[in-house]
Swiss-Prot record:
Substrate binds at R22, R29, H134, T349. It catalyses: 6-carboxyhexanoyl-[ACP] + L-alanine + H(+) = (8S)-8-amino-7-oxononanoate + holo-[ACP] + CO2. Homodimer. This is 8-amino-7-oxononanoate synthase. It comes from Beijerinckia indica subsp. indica (strain ATCC 9039 / DSM 1715 / NCIMB 8712).
Length: 386
């Protein structure tokens, strides 16, 4: 065995011993709710397709029309020949929905964050980031030479202290947070963060991947508050409630113009395929016209938390923290045998000691299935959580 294979094998053996090795299981979703895994048909509570739009006829028809008219791929970077008119139309729609001046489409949410952050801050700058922020926000900080300070989850007092102590020593400051936290389902205290950031001349960026389409009348986490706070940098993805693929940033026109000329993940990545832009536009049509659809995922999550006697869900994401890897793997297998797919979440995705079942509720889940799920989950929960 050569040194490369030996290295990989040793890493895999260590992960296997700690119950942290991950493997891909072939699966396919039939209709946005039901999924076939290893030949077994399961009701999924793991998918981020919150509005069940991946199989919606309007999205499929829009994508098919775009493929037949424009082809499958963009063919080049947006700065070369990949800037299809549908992308600019989508940017205008997203900016209007999010209440910003302009928008920039990226190839994926991960590409957005790893492009935006190093474009904005560098050697003489400061980044503050929530300890539970998504991995791609942390990845973006690693691509910048800026000084990074991590603050305790949603801890306003620590943010205030860090900025009061450090802000004067840096040229610019950027605060990074999720709008809706992907593993905990709670919302960031955006009004308080916005006020502190304004006071200290710190730029606030919210990753709203799990907010668009399901929170704040579909406009995202900023609009969950009244009045909506000013968030100068609103990032998100097109792969969750939108049902497709891609990422975006909504911001002022000067910021967006800077992204389109300097963000490396725009400049050096092929543009988003026209079909994905077309399906995203169809999704926005539905989000803007069907308020009942938008409300349903959160209502379903709250039906689940009410049945279990938990605090009301703040988003379609509900975690049940079991602690150990062994406990969460066993619980996931129990749910599997009962016909439910609920993916166990283990470190390093979540901190050590907080392995959990992560439930994602969609518009299509039926009340009777949610109540049945809750009844199966109840005996699996730690006593202190009941």
């Amino acid at each position: 065995m050569n040194s490369l294979d030996a290295f990989a094998a040793a890493k895999l053996a260590d992960l296997e011993e700690r119950g942290l090795r991950r493997t891909l299981r072939e699966n396919w979703r039939e209709d946005g709710l039901w999924i076939s895994v290893d030949g077994q048909k399961l009701l999924s509570f793991s998918c981020n397709d919150y509005l069940n739009l991946t199989h919606h006829p309007a999205l499929k028809a829009a994508a098919i029309r775009a493929i037949e008219t424009y082809g499958v791929g963009a063919g080049a970077s947006r700065l070369v020949t990949g800037n299809h008119p549908l992308l600019e139309k989508l940017e205008a729609r997203l900016a209007a929905l999010k209440g910003s001046e302009a928008a920039c489409i990226f190839g994926a949410g991960y590409l957005a964050n790893t492009g935006i952050i190093p474009t904005l801050v560098g050697k003489d700058d400061l980044i503050l980031i929530d300890e539970l922020a998504h991995a791609c926000l942390f990845a973006g900080t690693q691509l910048s030479p800026a000084t990074v300070r991590i603050f305790r989850h949603n801890d306003i007092a620590e943010v205030e202290s860090l900025l009061a102590t450090n802000r004067a020593h840096y040229r610019h400051a950027l605060l990074l947070t999720d709008g809706v936290f992907s593993m905990d389902g709670d919302l960031a205290p955006l009004p308080a963060l916005a006020e502190i950031c304004t006071h200290h001349d710190c730029w606030l960026m919210a990753d709203d991947a799990h907010g668009l389409g399901v929170i704040g009348q579909g406009r995202g986490s900023r609009h969950a508050f009244d009045p909506a706070p000013v968030i100068p940098l609103q990032m998100g993805t097109l792969s969750k409630a939108i049902g497709g693929y891609g990422g975006y940033l909504c911001a002022s026109k000067p910021v967006i113009d800077l992204m389109k000329t300097r963000a490396r993940t725009v400049v050096y990545s092929t543009g988003l395929p026209p079909a994905l832009a077309a399906s995203a536009l169809a999704a926005l049509d539905l989000i803007e016209s069907d308020s009942d659809l938008v409300k349903k995922p959160l209502a379903n999550a709250r039906l689940f938390t009410t049945r279990l006697g938990l605090s009301p869900a703040q988003s379609p994401i509900v975690p049940i923290i079991l602690g150990t890897v062994e406990a969460v793997m066993s619980a996931a297998q129990t749910l599997f045998t009962q016909g439910f797919l609920v993916t166990p979440i283990r470190p390093p995705t979540v901190p050590e000691g907080t392995a959990r079942l992560r439930f994602a509720f969609t518009a299509g889940h039926a009340a009777e299935d949610i109540l049945h799920l809750a009844d199966v989950v109840a005996p699996l929960m730690p006593a202190k959580a009941r």
